[in-house]
From Swiss-Prot:
Subunit structure: Component of the small ribosomal subunit (SSU). Mature yeast ribosomes consist of a small (40S) and a large (60S) subunit. The 40S small subunit contains 1 molecule of ribosomal RNA (18S rRNA) and at least 33 different proteins. The large 60S subunit contains 3 rRNA molecules (25S, 5.8S and 5S rRNA) and at least 46 different proteins.
Note: There are 2 genes for eS19 in S.pombe.
Subcellular location: Cytoplasm; Nucleus; Nucleus, Nucleolus
Keywords: Cytoplasm, Nucleus, Ribonucleoprotein, Ribosomal protein
The protein, known as: Small ribosomal subunit protein eS19A
Role according to the record: Component of the ribosome, a large ribonucleoprotein complex responsible for the synthesis of proteins in the cell. The small ribosomal subunit (SSU) binds messenger RNAs (mRNAs) and translates the encoded message by selecting cognate aminoacyl-transfer RNA (tRNA) molecules. The large subunit (LSU) contains the ribosomal catalytic site termed the peptidyl transferase center (PTC), which catalyzes the formation of peptide bonds, thereby polymerizing the amino acids delivered by tRNAs into a polypeptide chain.
Region (Disordered): 83-102
Amino acid sequence: MAGVSVKDVDAQKFITAYAAFLKRSGKMTTPQWIDIVKTGTHKELAPYDPDWYYVRAAAIARHIYLRKQVGVGRLCKVYGGSVNRGMRPSHHRDGSGSVQRKVVQSLEKIGVLEKSDNGGRRISQQGQRDLDRIAYSLLEEESE
C-alpha cells in the first residue's frame, strides 16, 4: 500500500467507489431537502441520481485532496456552470453555496476534512488515509 495515492487512480472510478463507501458506512447524514434542491441557479431541475449527495461529497473530498486547501466559495465556482439565456449570450453562474457548505460540513463531521488556519478546509490525516486506502483497493482490482 506504500506510495499509492488518489492521483494514481482514474477520477471517475475513484469518485464512484468513494461515494459507495460513504453510503455503505452510514456515518454521513444527508439533509432532508436533497431530493428537491437544485444544485445551482444555472440548473432547471434537481439531480436525477438519488445518491448525488454522496457523489458530490466524494468529488469534493478528491478535489480538496489534490490541493492544499479549498474554501466553499471556490467550490461554488467549480460546481457552477453557464446559464441558458435563450438567444442572449450565456454567462457563468456559481453553484449553490448551501449545498457545498453542507457537504463540507458533513465531511468535516466524519473526520475527512478539517478547518485550515488560513481559511477554507484541508484534508485531515484520517481522511487522507481513507482516500489512499480506497485508491489502493481500486489499483488492486485493476491488476487482477
